[in-house]
C-alpha cells in the first residue's frame, strides 16, 4: 500500500505518505475504542463482524479506484520464479545505501517508541501518576503525531527530506532523554507531545526519501525493507530498555536509547553527505 501511494504521488510524496500513515494511525487509535465499546454493548460477535464490514468496505473503495497496474515482471508459472525475483529485489535494495541509512533512522526512532510503550507506564506509576494520567500521555503523543504527519509531509516536499529527518531525530532524542528526569504530569504531557511531533517529522520524511531513493521497479521492495527495519527497531526497544533499566536506571536507559537516535542522525548526515559528492 505504501508503494502504491508513493507511485501515485511522485511530486507530492511527503504529503501523500504523511496522510497515509496518519490514516493508518487513526485506525489503530479508533479500533480499540470502537471494538471495546461494541464488545461491551453488543458482544464480541458484533465487534468482529463490524471489523470485517469495515475491511470489505475498504476493499470495495480500493477496487473503485481503477488503478493502472504495471505488467507482471514474472511471467513464468510456479513458486521458483517468484522467489528468484524476490531475491533480486532484496539484493538490489540491500545495496542501496540511501534506503538502508534512511530506514535505520526510522529504526532508531522506533526503538525509543517501543521503549516508551513498555516502560513509560511503569515510570509514570512510580512517580505518582494514576492509570488515567498515564493513558493520557500516550493519547497526547498519538494525537500530536496523527495531526503532524500530513503537515510535515507537505513541509518535506518543499524544504527537503534530509533536514527534517535530522531535526525529527534530535527532537525525539531530546524529549526522550528528558522524560525520566521529570515527575510532573504537565511536563510529561509536553514531552510526550514533543516526542509525537518528532516521530511524525521522521516518519513522513523518511518514507518519502526511501521512495525517492528506490528504483521504480524496486519501489515495493524499498518500502518493504523500510517497514522490516522499523519493525526490528520497534521490537528491540522494550528488550533493550528492560535490560538497561535492570542494570542501571531509567535515566541511564533512556540516555543510551536517546544516544542511539543521535548516532543514527550523525550516521545519516555523514552517509548522505558522502553519497551526494
Q: What is the meaning of each model-derived region?
A:
Residues 69-102:
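Juxtamembrane intracellular "pre-TM" segments in multi-pass secondary transporters
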Amino acid at each position: 500500500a505504501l508503494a502504491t501511494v508513493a507511485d501515485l504521488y511522485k511530486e507530492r510524496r511527503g504529503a501523500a505518505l504523511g496522510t497515509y500513515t496518519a490514516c493508518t494511525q487513526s485506525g489503530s487509535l479508533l479500533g480499540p475504542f470502537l471494538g471495546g465499546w461494541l464488545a461491551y454493548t453488543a458482544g464480541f460477535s458484533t465487534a468482529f463482524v463490524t471489523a470485517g464490514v469495515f475491511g470489505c468496505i475498504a476493499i470495495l473503495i480500493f477496487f473503485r479506484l481503477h488503478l493502472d497496474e504495471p505488467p507482471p515482471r514474472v511471467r513464468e508459472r510456479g513458486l521458483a520464479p517468484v522467489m528468484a525475483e524476490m531475491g533480486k529485489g532484496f539484493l538490489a535494495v540491500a545495496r542501496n545505501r540511501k534506503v538502508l541509512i534512511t530506514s535505520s533512522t526510522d529504526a532508531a526512532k522506533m526503538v525509543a517508541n517501543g521503549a516508551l510503550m513498555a516502560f513509560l507506564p511503569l515510570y509514570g506509576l512510580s512517580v505518582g501518576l494514576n492509570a488515567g494520567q498515564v493513558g493520557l500521555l500516550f493519547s497526547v503523543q498519538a494525537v500530536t503525531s496523527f495531526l503532524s504527519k500530513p503537515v510535515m509531509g507537505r513541509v518535506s516536499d518543499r524544504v527537503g527530506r534530509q533536514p527534517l529527518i535530522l531535526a525529527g531525530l534530535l527532537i525525539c532524542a531530546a524529549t526522550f532523554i528528558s522524560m525520566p528526569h521529570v515527575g510532573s504530569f504537565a511536563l510529561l504531557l509536553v514531552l510526550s507531545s514533543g516526542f509525537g511531533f518528532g516521530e511524525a517529522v521522521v516518519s513522513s520524511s523518511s518514507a518519502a526519501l526511501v521512495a525517492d531513493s528506490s528504483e521504480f521497479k524496486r519501489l515495493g521492495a524499498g518500502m518493504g525493507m523500510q517497514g522490516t527495519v522499523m519493525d526490528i527497531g520497534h521490537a528491540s526497544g522494550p528488550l533493550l530498555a528492560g535490560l538497561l533499566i535492570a542494570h542501571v536506571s531509567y535515566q541511564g536507559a533512556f540516555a543510551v536509547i536517546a544516544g542511539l537516535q543521535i548516532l543514527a542522525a550523525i550516521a545519516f548526515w555523514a552517509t548522505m553527505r558522502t553519497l551526494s559528492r
